Amino acid sequence: MPSLRDIRNRIGSVRSTRQITKAMKMVSAAKLRRAQDAVLKTRPYAVLLDQTLSRLAARAAAEEQVAHPLLAPRAQRTAEVVVVTSDRGLAGGFNSNICRFVQRFLTENADRFERIALSTVGKKGREYFKARRLEIRKDYTGVHANLAYEKAEALAREATERYLAGEVDAVFLAYNEFKSAISQKQVVVQLLPIDTSAAGADATGIDFKYEPSREALLAELLPRHVAMQVWRALLESAASEHGARMSAMESATKNAEEMIASLSLQYNRARQAYVTKELMEIVGGAEALK
């Protein structure tokens, strides 16, 4: 049975842990509010840009005037999956969920592609796939620190350059889509080539006018569309990470409080037993002196 001192030390240790988890929960809650605002502001623009460009591209394809390599279909032998994870842990199943989701995607598409490589955004994804000896083509570090659109633009530009150079025939983007503070959805979207199949029917009945030209418009907007999809994925992942960490720290804080209550009860019982034993010894000594 542990001594009173051991129990007191354990209570003090758990209280210190509770203070840390409570502080981390508050920090994550503040970051979540900012990240959630950024996601809600970005989503409408990203969705509208996606719809508009998909319709433009679908119309061009319908008229057999595809003039941009990001739209041109080709045989898909090699693929790349860009996986967005976090640099830090203590976020519940945030990182493990998306990593396992990507592993299932790789298994399900093993027959579709001759070779699938990975690019990781975040230390946790790199560590996960490196431990499983999977090919990591590119590791992006420092993206989550001071998250900015320029970083998403650079990442999208590098992926586009690899695609245009013929190093890969398809690029996919995997990330946690933010639903709520306690809910995230793992998704994999095709980044390149840009998929216009969903907008084909809607675009045929629309009369588009292009200034200065269709080719110039697509050349300007398609790379921006790819960058915006990457930017949205980074924002969605950041909000999901903060929400997952806030929930994990809230759960850890509650567990610490329950443990403190249990240890306090154990301490009081041990102290009561110790006092009772002392009284019995005093009474026994007094009886012996009679």
UniProtKB/Swiss-Prot annotation:
Keyword field: ATP synthesis, Cell inner membrane, Cell membrane, CF(1), Hydrogen ion transport, Ion transport, Membrane, Transport
GO CC list: plasma membrane; proton-transporting ATP synthase complex
Compartment(s): Cell inner membrane
Domain of life: Bacteria
Membrane topology listed for this record: Peripheral membrane protein
Family in the record: Belongs to the ATPase gamma chain family.
Protein name: ATP synthase gamma chain
Protein species of origin: Anaeromyxobacter sp. (strain K)
Gene: atpG
